[in-house]
Design a protein with these regions (language model features):
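Conserved catalytic core of Hanks-type protein kinase domains
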Residues: 51-52, 64
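Conserved short beta-strand edge segments in small beta-sheet-based binding/regulatory domains
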Residues: 68-79
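Short, electropositive alpha-helical surface patch
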Residues: 58-65
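Short S/T/G/P-rich N-terminal loop/turn motif that feeds into the first structured element of a domain
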Residues: 1-35, 39-45, 53-57, 77-87
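A short local loop/turn or secondary-structure capping micro-motif enriched for an aromatic residue
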Residues: 13-14, 67-69
Length: 87
């Protein structure tokens, strides 16, 4: 399962997020794969693609950040998969 995670940094402040990342890493449990991410120019939001087979791994990861990040989770598919489904 691929998911697009939209992270809204609490109070629009990325500093606590990047400080924790430097200190503790991504905090992703075994089985949750980071694919890639992009951050808005104003550093208020991050768009991140993650992959896992077990939704509870994603929930565990989000719980480790939920005090400083608000999350939106959107299931996604690749363009190739979308084309196949649309045929």
């Amino acid at each position: 399962m691929l998911v697009m995670i939209i992270e809204h940094f609490r109070n629009g402040d990325p500093k606590p997020v990047y400080a924790r990342f430097r200190e503790r890493g991504r905090l992703a449990p075994e089985g949750l794969k980071y694919v890639s991410s992009w951050v808005t120019d104003d550093l208020a939001r991050c768009y991140q693609v993650m992959e896992c087979e077990d939704r509870s791994l994603l929930d565990q990861w989000m719980a480790a950040w939920s005090d400083i990040v608000e999350f939106e989770v959107i299931p996604i598919v690749t363009s190739a998969e979308a084309a196949k489904r649309a045929s």
